[in-house]
């Protein structure tokens, strides 16, 4: 029996494209396990349920490698669990991922390709960390600029001139809590 597995990383993303591909490949829609969770999460309920319910001779169909795993170690572990049930796994896009035969080239390619996939993620992560470190060295912090920084001088000036908090809130458009935080930061309150 063909069994499908479809996964997206967030609730906002749609599984429709993957489900359509799996159905077109010949997987019965009732046999598609669907998940909206990061591939990096170790506990994926639907993946575990699918593997538990596999029967000898079943074939798990995925649209591509990244749908079932984001790390080499995890991928190889999942494949071992599927094989232990007497089942196999095939990828529609990554055609080299096919454990239904004992082809040594498929095993070799699986190991190499999953390793390259892990290398790519590690390089992206490294570049991101380097970029954040570089930005921090230039005095930039991540995220949206704070509203307090834009109007802190105005809040301090108005407070020193004797304006009440209510009036400062009206003039600056900041919340009371933000005005108090700014005054605290400026050591005026």
UniProtKB/Swiss-Prot annotation:
Keyword DNA-binding attached: yes
One GO MF term attached to the UniProt entry: DNA binding
UniProt keywords, alphabetically: DNA integration, DNA recombination, DNA-binding, Plasmid
Region (Disordered): 130-151
Chain segments annotated as coiled-coil in the UniProt record: none
Active site: 9
Keyword tRNA-binding annotated: no
Resolvase/invertase-type recombinase catalytic domain ranges (all copies): 1-139
InterPro entries: Homeodomain-like_sf (IPR009057), Recombinase_CS (IPR006118), Resolv_N (IPR006119), Resolvase-like_N_sf (IPR036162), Resolvase_HTH_dom (IPR006120), SSR_resolvase (IPR050639)
Matches recorded under SUPFAM superfamilies: Homeodomain-like (SSF46689), Resolvase-like (SSF53041)
GO annotation terms (biological process): DNA integration
Portion annotated as DNA-binding: 165-184
Family: Belongs to the site-specific recombinase resolvase family.
UniProt xrefs under PANTHER family: DNA-INVERTASE FROM LAMBDOID PROPHAGE, SERINE RECOMBINASE PINE-RELATED
Entry function: A likely role for the res protein would be to stabilize pIP404 by reducing the number of plasmid multimers resulting from homologous recombination.
Protein name: Resolvase
Organism (species): Clostridium perfringens
């Amino acid at each position: 029996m063909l069994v499908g597995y479809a996964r997206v990383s967030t609730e906002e993303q749609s599984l429709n494209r993957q489900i359509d591909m799996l159905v077109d490949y010949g997987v019965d829609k009732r046999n598609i396990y669907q998940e909206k969770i990061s591939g990096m999460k170790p506990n994926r309920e639907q993946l575990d349920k699918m593997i538990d319910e596999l029967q000898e001779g079943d074939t798990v169909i995925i649209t591509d490698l990244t749908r079932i795993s984001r790390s080499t170690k995890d991928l190889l572990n999942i494949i071992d669990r599927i094989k232990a049930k007497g089942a196999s796994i095939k990828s529609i896009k990554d055609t080299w991922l096919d454990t239904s035969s004992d082809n040594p080239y498929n095993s070799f390619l699986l190991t190499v390709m999953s390793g390259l996939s892990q290398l790519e993620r590690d390089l992206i992560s490294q570049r991101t960390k380097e970029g954040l470190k570089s930005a921090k060295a230039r005095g930039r912090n991540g995220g949206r600029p704070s509203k307090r920084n834009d109007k802190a001088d105005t809040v301090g000036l108005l407070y020193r001139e004797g304006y009440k908090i209510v009036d400062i809130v009206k003039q600056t458009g900041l919340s009371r809590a933000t005005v108090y935080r700014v005054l605290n930061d400026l050591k005026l309150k």
